[in-house]
Amino acid sequence: SSEKIMDFIIRCDPDVVQPLRNVVDDTYESSGLKNYIDTHNLGICFFSPLKHGLLTGKYTEPVTFTNGDHRSGVKEFQDTTLLKIILSNKTLLEQRFFNHPNPVLHGLVDSLLFDVPTGCVLLGQRNVQQVQAASTLGKLLTAKDAEWVKTLYSS
């Protein structure tokens, strides 16, 4: 977590840190990590920006993963209400960013980077289509668009 990184960052003196961050799980700023990164001009690489695919709207019904699959411990995959909200948000992202080839990914990923000049995200890409989709990302959102995306997932 960003909070845990802050507990050790001074002693470790890293060049780059890798916290969890997505539009649902986001303590990057509230933990003080953003301020530290900006002040010390460090690199940052966010992992789980799609929350294991959950935020893409790909899952419309609760899903059970096989034993050993890291997603089996993510309770949100079983939350019918949340899955409906995510599906609705997917539609809203598609409408707002209709001119982007991957509007959902654009909103979810690029909203994390709009004010992070030394940042990147780690996307788990398992096939050529996912690599091609990822290659369309990186066009920064405006502060207004980034805030709109985050607001979709904050309620």
What are these regions (language model features)?
Residues S1-S154:
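Beta/alpha (TIM)-barrel catalytic core signal, keyed to glycine-rich beta->alpha loops juxtaposed to Asp/Glu
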